[in-house]
Amino acid sequence: MRNASKKHLDLPYRPGVGMMILNADNHIFVGKRIDTKISAWQMPQGGIVPGETPSIAAMREMLEEIGSDKGYIIAESKCWYSYDLPSFLIPKLWNGNFRGQKQRWFLIRFTGNNEDININTSNPEFDQWRWASLNELLSIIIPFKRKLYQAVVKEFDSLIQ
């Protein structure tokens, strides 16, 4: 891995979930990360609390990150997807205990309105949000997550059309 040093490769992946949230027009929710100066757009994601199932974690994280849990799960990924953080980020996230995340992904149909979305939560992760087309998603996503996103899009593509 060009992003991770040998020491970092010995670290485990943090277990988590990712959510591809679709609106009625089959556009995908993306948020711009609040903790960076670069244009870092991503789909909502988060950790799994011990004892929590991935599907419960996905709906909890949806509420925590977009301020709404108005939606339902269409599909769960068949496998765990992982990504490695760039080396410079490892010491800054999760106390330096993880090299990246392994995630179970969920395709979720958002049943609310735009007014139901509130990214100004108690621990905000995004300072902007919008709906992106499937094609646009891969062009705006933060580069080190692009390969993972391509795999998730490939798996869920037939369910989005």
Curated annotation (Swiss-Prot):
Gene name of this polypeptide: rppH
Organism phylogeny: Bacteria, Pseudomonadati, Pseudomonadota, Alphaproteobacteria, Rickettsiales
GO molecular function: mRNA 5'-diphosphatase activity
Taxonomy, superkingdom: Bacteria
Cofactor(s) it depends on: a divalent metal cation
Record-level GO cellular component terms: cytoplasm
Biological processes, Gene Ontology terms: mRNA catabolic process
Organism expressing this protein natively: Rickettsia canadensis (strain McKiel)
InterPro entries named among the record's database cross-references: NUDIX_hydrolase-like_dom_sf, NUDIX_hydrolase_CS, NUDIX_hydrolase_dom, RppH
Top-level EC class as recorded in UniProt: hydrolase
Record EC number: 3.6.1.-
Cell wall biogenesis/degradation found in the keyword field: no
Nudix hydrolase domain boundaries: 12-154
Keyword Acetylation among record annotations: no
Function: Accelerates the degradation of transcripts by removing pyrophosphate from the 5'-end of triphosphorylated RNA, leading to a more labile monophosphorylated state that can stimulate subsequent ribonuclease cleavage.
Family that this chain belongs to: Belongs to the Nudix hydrolase family. RppH subfamily.
Motif position, Nudix box: 46-67
UniProt-recorded name of the protein: RNA pyrophosphohydrolase
Entry keyword set: Hydrolase
